[in-house]
Amino acid sequence: MLKIGSHVSMSGKHMLLAASQEASSYGANTFMIYTGAPQNTRRKKIEDLNIEAGRAHMEENGISDIVVHAPYIINIANTTNPATFELGVEFLRSEIERTSAIGARQIVLHPGAHVGAGAETGIQKIIEGLNEVIDPNQNVQIALETMAGKGSECGRTFEELAQIIDGVTHNEHLSVCFDTCHTHDAGYDVVSDFDGVLNEFDKIVGIDRLKVLHINDSKNVRGARKDRHENIGFGEIGFDALQYIVHHDQLKDIPKILETPYVGEDKKNKKPPYRFEIEMLKNKQFDEELLEKIKQQ
């Protein structure tokens, strides 16, 4: 069964319940959340996340395998500022606790940026950080995201991800989140040779590590190393390639999460595309009028 959803908001007083209700309104059967704003460390207490009501709503609406995304401010690749590294380690630990309490089993993490020290140095620091963070008894996996290679990002190649995983002691607690936009922007040919890319991933990392898919089109040509998401079918990857990935036999049990942009000219009144994009991917039929339909909802 196709497991598809999108990024949704967990906020206000209803928190997890609000996230599940939003996902349900999109026709989704999974979703991804941040536990708070992705650009800061302000977080509600676990008892204020409205977990019981949220889980009950999920069960009633056939929603499962939800995913948490760690905030961008975590950078455990940073060797130049010890405070940034320590904050990353501490905050990632507390995010794993929240992820576990919510009932999610995957927390997606951008591996980090080496901020000029070089990829090798950054990767060693990421390994050090993950070894500090991981509790051998935790029931959550940290899903390292495939990155576009923007700036000094680590994790642009499958080899870099494999190097991180191999360096971590309790690496049974590590998985991978494959982002279609990032992988395309990093230079992999997901458009005309996705099977080749997947085989390469399997050889280098292992397909059994693949636990989350971010399904995004890209505003950029392959190899641009920019990381700018586009609506499904309206970018450089295109609908056919993305729907092939979404319905791929080897990936059928993996949650697929859309992180495509809201639509509209008015910055204050953009509309979420997810109900329309999910339906279009389920139907396997590209709709050229989609962006207009999203605006008119």
From Swiss-Prot:
UniProt-annotated binding residues for Zn(2+) 3: 182, 227, 229
Binding residues annotated for Zn(2+) 2, in chain numbering: 145, 179, 214, 259
SMART domains assigned: AP2Ec (SM00518)
UniProt keyword DNA damage, yes or no: yes
A Gene Ontology BP annotation from the UniProt entry: base-excision repair
Cofactor binding summary note: Binds 3 Zn(2+) ions.
Reaction(s) catalysed by this chain's protein: Endonucleolytic cleavage to 5'-phosphooligonucleotide end-products
A Pfam family this chain is assigned to: AP_endonuc_2
Residues binding Zn(2+) 1, per UniProt: 69, 110, 145
Names of the cofactor(s): Zn(2+)
Enzyme's top EC category: hydrolase
Keyword Glycoprotein carried by entry: no
Enzyme Commission code(s) on record: 3.1.21.2
Molecular functions (GO terms): deoxyribonuclease IV (phage-T4-induced) activity; DNA binding; DNA-(apurinic or apyrimidinic site) endonuclease activity; phosphoric diester hydrolase activity; zinc ion binding
Keyword set, alphabetical order: DNA damage, DNA repair, Endonuclease, Hydrolase, Metal-binding, Nuclease, Zinc
Role noted for this protein: Endonuclease IV plays a role in DNA repair. It cleaves phosphodiester bonds at apurinic or apyrimidinic (AP) sites, generating a 3'-hydroxyl group and a 5'-terminal sugar phosphate.
Membership in a protein family: Belongs to the AP endonuclease 2 family.
Record's protein name: Probable endonuclease 4
Natural source organism: Bacillus licheniformis (strain ATCC 14580 / DSM 13 / JCM 2505 / CCUG 7422 / NBRC 12200 / NCIMB 9375 / NCTC 10341 / NRRL NRS-1264 / Gibson 46)
Gene: nfo
